[in-house]
């Protein structure tokens, strides 16, 4: 969904009012008029203010304006208009406890390219800050509860960027479970279907003991986690668009 189709960011506009506008044929900012039925003068003024600020934000590539305006559950709407700023990332660790476990690899995918940082080599606070510096929008799977706080604890970095967490977003269309389960449901394949989080821990331990190929396999798994979030994101956004928007306003009607 293009940002210009959203009215949800205006103060006093919830999903009910937004849908009412869409059903009247007001499916784009350009089509909004103060005379729209069921809006009222105060709310109309707020919508116009949101649209004015939104246009400036789009011109400035400012994702944060909409991140502040939208409720958490609507952040998936940021993707279509700001996909070029999206940085997909995933971490591997030696366990779930942030205090007793360590981060072993971090993979970041942006602009069609993937970079992996490895513990003991180039995985440092400075390299992470540099990697995330130009990211306007973060995309993770369960990152709000795991990846982001883990990196904060391990490296002292605050990733306060606009952030789409795919796990709760997938639930909106009935997809539950971990990333691999979602991929399977969507028909997205893997080169390493037999590797999971537990195997990733074992691979790191083997690497520490000097086993040939263990690190390479771990990196491949981490990169696959990261890169596969792209088709998941694309599919989920498309389905949510089709569920929410009236037929004439859907992407295939543009």
Q: Where on the chain are the PLM-derived regions?
A:
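Acidic, Mg2+-coordinating catalytic module of metal-dependent nucleases/exonucleases
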Residues: 185-253
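Acidic active-site catalytic centers that drive phospho-/nucleotidyl reactions
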Residues: 90-92, 147, 165, 225
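Catalytic micro-motifs at enzyme active sites that drive phosphoryl/nucleotidyl and oxygen chemistry
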Residues: 75-78, 93-97, 127-128
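Surface-exposed cleft-lining segments at the edges of enzyme active sites
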Residues: 93, 113-119, 214
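N-terminal accessory regions of nucleic-acid-interacting proteins
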Residues: 1-83
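Short glycine/proline-enriched turns and hinge-like loops at secondary-structure junctions
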Residues: 98-102
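Two-metal-ion RNase H-like nuclease active-site motif
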Residues: 84-95, 222
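Conserved DEDDh/DEDDy metal-dependent 3′-5′ exonuclease domain
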Residues: 105-108, 114-189
